[in-house]
Amino acid sequence: GIPSRQTPLAVWEVVRESLLHRRIFKVNPLLGYMHMSLAFGWFLLIVVGWIETVAYLGFRYVPLHGHVFFKYFATELPHKPVFDFLMDLLLLFVLSGVTLAFGKRIYSQAMGMRRTTRHVLGDRIALSVLWLIFPARLLAESITCALHGGGGFLTGTIGEWMAHHVNPIVLQTLYEPLWWAYSICLGLFFVALPFSRYMHIFTEIPLIFLRRYKLHSTEKEGSFDRFQTDACSRCGICIDPCQLQSELGIDDVQSVYFLRDRRYNHLRQSVANNCLMCGRCEQRCPVGIELNTLRLNSRDTMRNTPDEKRYEYFQGVDRSAGEGRVGYFAGCMTLLTPRILLAMERIFKASGEEVWWADKEGGVCCGRPLKLSGETDSARKMMDYNIALFRKHRITTLVTSCPICLKVFREEYHLEGIEVLHHSEYMLRLIRDGRLQLRRGAQTFTYHDPCELG
């Protein structure tokens, strides 16, 4: 429920990630500052501006948006230097972020990004008016200071310069249009917001709370997925880590484009399927969106799955061999590379280990490749078959040479009471226990650390 220990943790995460953008700071400090200045700076402008309005009006009730045009209506009230200074400081803080955001579109590498997101029309409109809101506010408040005095170190200084160098008639003529420009930019932004990337402002915060309350996306599409797709800010941080982009130049299938297309209901199979599911983008995502799960359940929904009875034939089949509490599952990749299987036979024999061979003479795949293709129901049949086989032979340790099998055994098989090891981990244990003797030689070996093993 909401009144739980997770609630204060969720509140702190909202402050840390939605306002201060800690994860983006880890990617690049300048990029983190840019996002923080826009989010946290605007938030403080709202809060401090509201406090200023309440203080000016004698602590009467004022709605939170009551400060937006306060400087337009409150030109004759006495100025309070503390608020003038704070509001100017916060406005400068936000303007520095706007400047960096504009610079990022020109030279993104200065902020550690080789590629940036290609935005759709709705994003471009919202982005353009967002960049104009705060310069328009600066000009509107400065011209007010020029005509009525007051202001802080920023608006007051600019206003004083205007008063000395611009004809008063021109100032009077521009006064209303500048406030209208600020108003129009602000209004256009909120009109465009639901149709743009900036919808994440209103979905990221509830997503954090729901995630803290243990709600997650699953292998099947669900209503919770909408929170995740809308919470993507399309920051583009997921683009550079993608190997399809960096090594092959494929630049239209990354998670930012997958989520965008899924949100607008024009997701193509080529975008959903053309992904290695390595998880690099998910690891870098500052919002913590479950990118692999969403892509997987999209594949499941879009796939034209054949007859679901086609895997029922292997129920009850047992082609395993041997006895022992240590089981060895070769997996498809090992069976396609017989030298690995022969090497493991020699290692088991040298260590004196009695082994149960799950699929030495052929068996059922671990199910992960089928699941990654979108056939989650068929993959579950394979997994259930293997689980029953492991339980039947009462193994306590399961060794595999295939990193793909290792990953799915550990993450999706729920093999309580069975220890799952990669053969490299198992060999290290044999060496430490003195059951496998090594001899120094002159040979040089190269070891490849697979992505799935990492």
For each feature predicted by the language model, list its residue ranges:
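Iron-sulfur cluster-binding electron-transfer modules in prokaryotic oxidoreductases
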Residues: M162-V170, T218-K220, Q283-R284, L291-G454
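Short, solvent-exposed helix-helix connector turns and helix-capping sites enriched
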Residues: N28, R263, G374-E375
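Ferredoxin-type iron-sulfur electron-transfer modules in oxidoreductases and energy-metabolism complexes
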Residues: R212-T229, I237-R284, G288-G316, S378-K381
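A short secondary-structure junction motif
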Residues: S18, R22, F209-R212, Q245, ...
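Flexible loop/turn segments at secondary-structure boundaries
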Residues: S142, G149-G152, I201-F202, F209, ...
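Membrane-embedded alpha-helical bundles of multi-pass integral membrane proteins
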Residues: G1-S223, I239, R299-M302
